[in-house]
Amino acid sequence: MRCWHGLLLWLTALSAGAAPLTLEVQDAAGRPLAGAVVFLESAAARRQVRPLAQAEMGQQGKAFVPDVLVVPVGTAVDFPNRDTVRHHVYSFSPAKKFELKLYIGTPAKPVVFDQPGVVVLGCNIHDHMVGWVLVVDTPYHAQTGADGRAVLDAPPGRYRLRSWHAGLPVGAPALEQALTLTDAAQTATVRMSGVRP
């Protein structure tokens, strides 16, 4: 058991043969943590990353939908406004600074997310609106469901397992832990501390 920046990880080999990595993400109290993003980084993974053909984060009911979007580096994201009021979407995050001034409908050009990192979004008109685009430099990423579980399929090798949640303090980087995958099925439990409910 090893604790590193609030990340606790247990790794167990289950059987021989190629199989996926199953992650169980928990909060500090050991409860399943829905909506956590987990991803595996390595030099080899970086060479495999490809932008998505299509991605969008809409605005509906004066909220970003979905509130968290995970995309590989280089992905162009549309921001359709499905409300009857105008929105002014912006980000001042170092990974991507941009502004889509007052609009209804879909802007003519999508926003290309060309650097990895956490991009916090807001609406200059509706201050309560907040969303996140997590830009990853790997094809091996997933978001946990209500049960706190996610499955990653990656070839054997040495990786950095990174975990992020929107409940982490603003500006907090993804937590990370070294991890070696074999050709056996593996299960890991990730415990994230510092996540607000």
Would you name each region that the model predicts?
Residues 2-10:
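Sec-dependent signal peptide recognition
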Residues 13-16:
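N-terminal signal peptide c-region/cleavage motif recognized by signal peptidases
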Residues 18-197:
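Extracytoplasmic copper-binding redox domains, predominantly the cupredoxin/blue-copper superfamily
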